[in-house]
Amino acid sequence: NPNGGAIALGHPLGGTGAILLTKALHELERTGTEHALVTMCCGGGLGTGTLLRRV
């Protein structure tokens, strides 16, 4: 994340996915790029990822 990550993002408990996706979408618009990848640790050895494509 070129604009900071982890604690630097600042978000309420349970809002991690929403804030990461929102920031990724804003970054797609700002830079004019086509793809963004959002990954997140869920704890307990789990993780999730989402690939976004701007159309």
Residue positions per predicted region:
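Claisen-condensing/thiolase-fold acyl-transfer catalytic domains that form or cleave C-C bonds
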Residues: 1-55
